[in-house]
Amino acid sequence: MLFNLRILLNNAAFRNGHNFMVRNFRCGQPLQNKVQLKGRDLLTLKNFTGEEIKYMLWLSADLKFRIKQKGEYLPLLQGKSLGMIFEKRSTRTRLSTETGFALLGGHPCFLTTQDIHLGVNESLTDTARVLSSMADAVLARVYKQSDLDTLAKEASIPIINGLSDLYHPIQILADYLTLQEHYSSLKGLTLSWIGDGNNILHSIMMSAAKFGMHLQAATPKGYEPDASVTKLAEQYAKENGTKLLLTNDPLEAAHGGNVLITDTWISMGQEEEKKKRLQAFQGYQVTMKTAKVAASDWTFLHCLPRKPEEVDDEVFYSPRSLVFPEAENRKWTIMAVMVSLLTDYSPQLQKPKF
């Protein structure tokens, strides 16, 4: 038993429309887990080993089981505050973070560009130091990865990447949890990316091989992934004995793939490129024709919001589509990230197979 639990109330307490057993618990020394992430930043998954990423997924599954399935109330973040800086609007990132942090007993504080202008009204250095004195962690959704790097350098509290131009690590954690739930294991899966060489693809490239997953990615000419990311992904594939295929042919990328993945073709800040991008991405829509060359057990992922030109309704709303469980898992994975960076908690649930 990893924790000493003492039941304070035998009756269910009604909280937020759910019945929770209110328990008092203390975090003892982990008996099974050797991974310690407390105090770390989460800027990119390239900074984390396979075991560390697996630990965050394990913790995600644990919190989901204890809170959603068992109805427990776990105030692991009671008395803690989270600063949320959003230069880009969001549905899933904001809602999952705010509800998740509050569900764990903490207080999230949302700041938009009207409240805080990174590096404009106040330097990034000063902002980082002020936030460090008032919050326990910061989740920032920004245009430039370099801004996150500066915040992390100057802050004395964990900085979490809620999205940048280069990476979107918390989305990939949700994707992997969804796939683990569906396939029971990640090792040996082939991920087929069809779309832009963007922050989602970059985050997959920084992590898939660490799970023993293969990656086949198709992007239009001129929209390939970042060269430095590609170089590191090739190194990871070599170290882990996995396949990495980068092509401009969507059907080649989809061939034999277990998981078909795409994303928006036009990210926020690229609106002026819309006409050019729509032309460049002709032939990249995921359809049943794409699925015909995939593995017999194929599934589909999209981080949302989705446009019909990216994936047709037949695939998007099919029983093979995991997009809505994927969206829900944004909540459980960001909760796990915050718990792992801010507490000594270790999962009670048996470690899943990865």
Swiss-Prot record:
Effect caused by changing A336S: In OTCD; late onset
Catalytic activity: carbamoyl phosphate + L-ornithine = L-citrulline + phosphate + H(+)
PROSITE patterns linked to this entry: CARBAMOYLTRANSFERASE
Effect of G83R: In OTCD; neonatal
Effect in UniProt of substituting F354C: In OTCD; late onset
Enzyme Commission number: 2.1.3.3
Phosphoserine: modified positions: S133
Documented effect of changing H302Y: In OTCD; neonatal
Consequence recorded when altering G39C: In OTCD; late onset
Active site: C303 (proton acceptor)
Outcome (variant: G50R): In OTCD; late onset
Effect caused by changing S207R: In OTCD; neonatal
Keywords: Acetylation, Amino-acid biosynthesis, Arginine biosynthesis, Disease variant, Mitochondrion, Phosphoprotein, Transferase, Transit peptide, Urea cycle
Role played: Catalyzes the second step of the urea cycle, the condensation of carbamoyl phosphate with L-ornithine to form L-citrulline. The urea cycle ensures the detoxification of ammonia by converting it to urea for excretion.
Name of the protein in its database record: Ornithine transcarbamylase, mitochondrial
Organism lineage string: Eukaryota, Metazoa, Chordata, Craniata, Vertebrata
